[in-house]
Amino acid sequence: MSTSRKLKSHGMRRSKSRSPHKGVKRGGSKRKYRKGNLKSRKRGDDANRNYRSHL
């Protein structure tokens, strides 16, 4: 079980870099920072991360 858990954690961390799942998570803020600038994009990402954390 411990190994499985470790693998899962690793997979999540690795997929965070580039994975279709991120597309869905980024989809919401995509519209946001699409209107704004690069700075807004960083802020949106942070907000999204916090929002997901709260969920």
From Swiss-Prot:
Disulphide-bridged cysteine pairs: none
Region of interest (Disordered), ranges: 1-55
Biased composition (Basic residues): 1-42
PROSITE patterns per record: TP1
Pfam families: TP1
Modified residues (Phosphoserine): S9, S40
MF annotations from Gene Ontology: DNA binding
Predominant location: nucleus
Recorded GO CC terms: male germ cell nucleus; nucleosome; nucleus
Subcellular location: Nucleus; Chromosome
GO biological process: chromatin remodeling; flagellated sperm motility; heterochromatin formation; negative regulation of DNA-templated transcription; nucleosome disassembly; positive regulation of protein processing; sexual reproduction; single strand break repair
Tissue expression notes: Expressed by spermatids (at protein level).
Coiled coil: none
InterPro entries in the record: Nuclear_transition_prot1, Nuclear_transition_prot1_CS
Keywords, in A-Z order: Chromosome, Developmental protein, Differentiation, DNA-binding, Nucleosome core, Nucleus, Phosphoprotein, Spermatogenesis
Lineage: superkingdom: Eukaryota
Known function: Plays a key role in the replacement of histones to protamine in the elongating spermatids of mammals. In condensing spermatids, loaded onto the nucleosomes, where it promotes the recruitment and processing of protamines, which are responsible for histone eviction.
Family: Belongs to the nuclear transition protein 1 family.
Protein name according to UniProt: Spermatid nuclear transition protein 1
Organism: Homo sapiens (Human)
